[in-house]
């Protein structure tokens, strides 16, 4: 993808991890719009990264972005997507685990390109697999700069990836805690 604006609907841990990965990568992004919902995380991200703008609301984020990343819980997604006005032909990348493509299309109600993705916390250090469904050349290129894209052709198969990814976040959290503990005990992080 060329120089574009992207927006993150939802400002939690996965959004933070993806944004960290973006700034460590060679991705050329003009501006990143983030939703104001979690003010604390939004302000921390804006302080760290100059190209971030905290949107006044979710609609402004959608209006300003070429790509919109849906990084909200399934409950929130179901509630807010119907109220938002997406642009025709906008690219939507959904991290919402339990909303399939048909449900997302129905909630969005516009002709947009939707790709589901499963980023995990190591994306912040540009590591790990990122399953996407359905395959999409631009989304694959984007995520290949943040890890290793795994294209899933069949959405039914993607359910297995969603299930296992739910177990990976706590696993990586435990590894991080253990690594931090070793550093406190005098071992260099590079070891």
Q: Can you annotate each of these PLM segments?
A:
Residues 2-56, 60, 64, 145:
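NAD(P)+-binding Rossmann beta1-loop-alpha1 motif at the extreme N-terminus of oxidoreductases
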Residues 13, 17, 21-22, 44, ...:
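Alpha-helical scaffold segments in soluble metabolic enzymes
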Residues 39, 49, 58-132, 136:
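Rossmann-like NAD(P)(H) cofactor-binding subdomain of soluble oxidoreductases
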Residues 55, 117, 152:
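Hydrophobic residues at beta-strand termini and immediately following loops
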